[in-house]
Design a protein with these regions (language model features):
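Short, extreme N-terminal segment that most often corresponds to the first beta-strand
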Residues: 1-29
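Charged interaction segments
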Residues: 25-137
């Protein structure tokens, strides 16, 4: 069984041999369907980027996600990669800590919501404020 998967985004990472090795594994895993780059930003930081769509055999998507997540300990800041898995939107958090990942995902969700807020009526905005207060927001 195979699955279509697309993913794109960037992660700023510390420059080190471990990151080079992970990037090489990701390139090998993705073959030619994905652009995988590691670009120097300054003396100590590189920007890892991935973009592409491909078909993966059983376990292939999970293996790619695990490789991408393994960049987390080397990440300078948490990042959210976005894509689609079998035509459904998906996100993958790459973060140095669980807390940093949760914060990055929260910011990502807020950025997704902001444009929709303009479409709410005044009454629905009040309902949203009430809902946020009820849930500790």
């Amino acid at each position: 069984m195979s699955a279509w998967y697309s993913i794109s985004g960037t992660v700023r990472v510390r420059r080190c041999p471990e990151v080079d090795a992970i990037a090489a594994q990701i390139r090998a895993h993705c073959d030619r369907d994905f652009a995988v780059n590691l670009v120097p930003m300054d003396a100590e930081v590189d920007e890892f980027s991935i973009e592409g769509t491909g078909e993966f055999g059983a376990g292939g998507v999970l293996a790619l996600d695990e490789l991408l997540e393994s960049l987390g300990p080397y990440a300078v800041a948490a990042a959210v990669l976005t894509g689609e898995y079998e035509n459904e939107p998906c996100e993958l958090v790459v973060a140095p800590t669980t807390e940093a990942g949760a914060t990055a995902l929260s910011h990502h969700r807020l950025d997704q919501i902001k444009p929709m807020l303009r479409e709410l009526t005044a009454q629905d905005r009040e309902s949203l404020v009430t809902l946020l207060r009820e849930h500790g927001g």
